[in-house]
Amino acid sequence: MAGKTLYDKLWNSHVVRTNPGGTALLYIDRHLVHEVTSPQAFEGLRLAGRKPWRKGANLAVPDHNVPTTDRSQGIQDPISRIQVEALDRNCQELGLTEFRMDDPRQGIVHIVGPEQGATLPGMTVVCGDSHTATHGAFGALAFGIGTSEVEHVLATQCLLQKKSKNMLIQVSGKLAPGVYSKDLILAIIARIGTAGGTGYTIEFAGETIRALSMEGRMTLCNMAIEAGARAGLVAVDETTIDYLKGRPFAPSPHSWGQAVNAWQMLQSDPDASFDRVVTIDAAALKPQVSWGTSPEMVASIDGRVPDPRQESDPTKRGGMERALEYMGLAANTPISEIRPDIIFIGSCTNARIEDLREAAKVVAGHKVAGNIKQALVVPGSGLVKRQAETEGLDQIFKEAGFEWREPGCSMCLAMNADRLEPEERCASTSNRNFEGRQGQGGRTHLVSPAMAAAAAVAGHFTDVSTLNH
C-alpha cells in the first residue's frame, strides 16, 4: 500500500461519507467563532429552529471590531458594536463558550485557540476567517469557511468539502540572524506566487521547520492562504507536544500519554507521494519587505523596488505598474530608503509573546524616529499582554515611544478605529498588503516584528541584523 501524506491521514480520518463528484462530508472537531462572520449564521440557525449540534466544539471570541484603546467607553462605531453585542447574545442564548471583550483571555481568535489548547493535533478546525490555516502548525487540518458554512457547522458539525492536492515545501538550512519565519513565508510566496498553492494543501517540512518554535510555525501556516493554498500543515514533534502540555483545553494528565501516542503518528509516511515539491534554501534568505499590493511582491532588504519594464509578461507588468503607482514608489528605489509613517506590530500572524520579545530586543535603548507618526504594539491576546507586562516588554516599548494597546485585530484591517489615512505608509507585521486593507489609500509593507521595530527606530527599512553594529 502506498504511503500517506499527513494531509491524506487527516482527511481520511474525518470523512463521514464520500459523494459522487469528488466531494466528501467531513466531520469538524473544533469550530472557532468571531463576531464578523457569525451573526447571519446564528440567525439562520434560529430561523430554522435548530440548536448547535455540539456546543462544546465551539469557542467564540470578538476580535475584528474591538477597540484597542480604553474599553471603558465601549465600542464607538455602531456596526462594530452591534456585531460584538450579537456575538455575546448568541453565545449566551445557545450556551456556547465565549471569551468576551472584558475577559482576560480575549484576543485574536487564531492566537486564543492555540494558547488555550483548543487546537490539538489530528483535529479538523474551521473558522469563518481565511487565516484559519494558522492552526495547521499543530498537525491539524484547519481552513477558513464562509458564513453559510458557519451555520452548517453549528447545525451539523459537518461540512461538504473537496479534497485538495498535496504540496510539500521542503526547507533546509539555518535561518541567519535577523531572519525569521515571517521572512521565510514571504520568500516562499514570492517564489511560488499567490496562486502557486491554489488547489493544494501545503505541508512545510525539513530541518528548518523542525527548528522553528510553535509561534514560528503558526506564522508560516497563517500565510499559506496568501500562497493560494487551502491549508498549511506542519507534522507533530516534541515541540508541538511540549507547547500543548498543561493548556486549559488540552487532554488531562490521565489521558495525556494516550493522546501523545496518537499525535506522534501524525507524520507523512517516508514513501508518501506529493503532487508538487518545492525546495527552499533558508540559509540564503535575507530579511524580506513587501513593496507592492500583493504578498508575492516582495524583495530582500538589500534589494530594490523592481522595474516593471524588465518584466516580459504583460499582465504581470501591468500589475507591477499599478502597484507602484498605488504605493507611491519609483522603480529601482533601494528598499532601505523607503520610509514608513506608521509602525504596526500585531495581528494573527505576529502578535504572540515570541514576536513581542524579538521586537523588544531591537527597540531596547532606542527611541522611535522623528519621522514616524505613530508606532503601535497590539498583543494578540490578554494572556500575551499579561505575559509581556510581567517580562517588562511593555515598558521597553513605551519608553521608546510606542503605544501599548489592548488585544485585537487592530490595524491589520480597516474594521475598527485603528486604520491608515490615505497615502500613509505602514511597516506592518500583518499578512495582507492589498489596496485599502489597512485603510482607504493606505500603503502596507509586510515585515517581521524585528524588521518593523528596526524601521521604527531607524525611520526607514533597515537590515535588523546590522542595526546595532
UniProtKB/Swiss-Prot annotation:
Catalyzes the isomerization between 2-isopropylmalate and 3-isopropylmalate, via the formation of 2-isopropylmaleate. Pfam families: Aconitase. GO terms for biological process: L-leucine biosynthetic process. Belongs to the aconitase/IPM isomerase family. LeuC type 1 subfamily. GO terms for molecular function: 3-isopropylmalate dehydratase activity; 4 iron, 4 sulfur cluster binding; metal ion binding. Its EC number is 4.2.1.33. Binds 1 [4Fe-4S] cluster per subunit. Keywords: 4Fe-4S, Amino-acid biosynthesis, Branched-chain amino acid biosynthesis, Iron, Iron-sulfur, Leucine biosynthesis, Lyase, Metal-binding. Its cofactor is [4Fe-4S] cluster. Heterodimer of LeuC and LeuD. [4Fe-4S] cluster binds at C348, C409, C412. It is an enzyme of class 4 (lyase). This is 3-isopropylmalate dehydratase large subunit. Pathway: Amino-acid biosynthesis; L-leucine biosynthesis; L-leucine from 3-methyl-2-oxobutanoate: step 2/4. InterPro entries: 3-IsopropMal_deHydase_lsu, Acnase/IPM_dHydase_lsu_aba_1/3, Acoase/IPM_deHydtase_lsu_aba, Aconitase_4Fe-4S_BS, Aconitase_4Fe-4S_dom, IPM_dehydratase_rel_enz, IPMI_cat. It catalyses: (2R,3S)-3-isopropylmalate = (2S)-2-isopropylmalate.
